């Protein structure tokens, strides 16, 4: 698994992810890039879960973004609608965190779309650790979204054996 964290603060949204790819209890790769920019660099996305399933989610989501001119929420909802008709999509073992200037969302391999209550979201095996760390930093410091995402990912990597310290970080200022 992995850890992906997204933090939004002061007209900046950041998605950060570690680089570990595991097969069972074995580390297969330590420098994978699980965070990327989509739709003319206006949307950030990160994935956790099975790599093949995550790429399927990425591909489907990116096509929805193109179809709906980069409108994040509409694209996510339209992707979720596909779950009702496409048997292949129904059991993907992956999750996406996506964000643009207006919203941050979780898209699950079960077809759920969730908008987080706070200005942060974290998924993956180290997601709970990263979320707790990020929430504490959001509530008790003036750190930037970038600094909070980086520090919370470091903390998750110190605790979760399926998360390492290699980081890919993308930020969007608006």
From Swiss-Prot:
Matches recorded under Pfam families: Proteasome (PF00227)
Claim: Nucleus is one of the keywords in the record: no
Molecular function via GO: metal ion binding; threonine-type endopeptidase activity
Domain of life where this protein originates: Bacteria
Record key words, sorted: Allosteric enzyme, Cytoplasm, Hydrolase, Metal-binding, Protease, Sodium, Threonine protease
Keyword Hydrolase assigned: yes
Localization (cell): Cytoplasm
Swiss-Prot/TrEMBL catalytic activity: ATP-dependent cleavage of peptide bonds with broad specificity
EC number: 3.4.25.2
Active site positions: 2
Positions of Na(+) binding: 157, 160, 163
GO cellular component: cytoplasm; HslUV protease complex; proteasome core complex
Subunit-structure text: A double ring-shaped homohexamer of HslV is capped on each side by a ring-shaped HslU homohexamer. The assembly of the HslU/HslV complex is dependent on binding of ATP.
Function: Protease subunit of a proteasome-like degradation complex believed to be a general protein degrading machinery.
Protein name: ATP-dependent protease subunit HslV
């Amino acid at each position: 698994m992995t850890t992906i964290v997204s933090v939004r603060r002061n007209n900046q949204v950041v998605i950060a992810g570690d680089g570990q790819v595991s097969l069972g209890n074995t580390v297969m790769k330590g420098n994978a890039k699980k965070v990327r920019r989509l739709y003319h660099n206006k949307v950030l996305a990160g994935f956790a879960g099975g790599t093949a399933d995550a790429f399927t989610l990425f591909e489907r989501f990116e096509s929805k973004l193109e179809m709906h001119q980069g409108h994040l929420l509409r694209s996510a909802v339209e992707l979720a609608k596909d779950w009702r008709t496409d048997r292949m999509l129904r059991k993907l073992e992956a999750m996406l965190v996506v964000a643009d200037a207006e919203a941050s969302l979780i898209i699950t391999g079960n077809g759920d779309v969730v908008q987080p209550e706070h200005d942060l979201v974290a998924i993956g095996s180290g997601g709970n650790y990263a979320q707790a760390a990020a929430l504490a930093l959001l509530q008790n410091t003036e750190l930037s979204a970038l600094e909070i995402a980086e520090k919370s990912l470091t903390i998750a990597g110190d605790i979760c054996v399926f998360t390492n310290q290699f980081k890919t970080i993308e930020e969007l200022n608006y």
